[in-house]
Amino acid sequence: MPEHTKVSAEDQALLNKFARSYQTQTQLKADVKEAKTLIDNINEASDEILLLDDEDSASIPCRIGSCFVHFNGDSLNEHLEGKKTTAEKVLSEKTSELDAISADMEQIKKVLYAKFGDQINLDAEE
């Protein structure tokens, strides 16, 4: 029977930190995906506005919250550019956070695998 390594309080703290980081990483991945989707949707909407003729672009409904506001083509493009800039900033921040937490998790994994070897599994099942 293989000998089991004792888990110290420091080891338990590292395991707990890894678990919290994993949850944060999962949420950040979802946030990054959401921001990318929003940017893609804004780009698609901007492209569609360019295809409209002058008559159709005089009053374009845009959902803001739970209601629709009518914009002309130029003001809607400005509105979309503002939203895109905000979404790109959020994407950049979330990506940086994700990279930092992933690097931290890799360091924790190295320490824990060095001590426990194959007695633990810290790799995500995807």
Curated annotation (Swiss-Prot):
Query: What Pfam families does this protein's entry cite?
Result: Prefoldin_2
Q: Which GO terms describe its molecular function?
A: unfolded protein binding
Q: Which keywords are on file for this protein?
A: Chaperone
Cited CDD domains: Prefoldin_4
**Alphabetized InterPro entries for the sequence:** PFD_beta-like, PFDN4
The subunit structure is:
Heterohexamer of two PFD-alpha type and four PFD-beta type subunits.
Q: What does this protein do?
A: Binds specifically to cytosolic chaperonin (c-CPN) and transfers target proteins to it. Binds to nascent polypeptide chain and promotes folding in an environment in which there are many competing pathways for nonnative proteins.
Q: Supply the name of the protein.
A: Probable prefoldin subunit 4
Protein source organism: Caenorhabditis elegans
By which gene is this protein encoded?
Answer: pfd-4
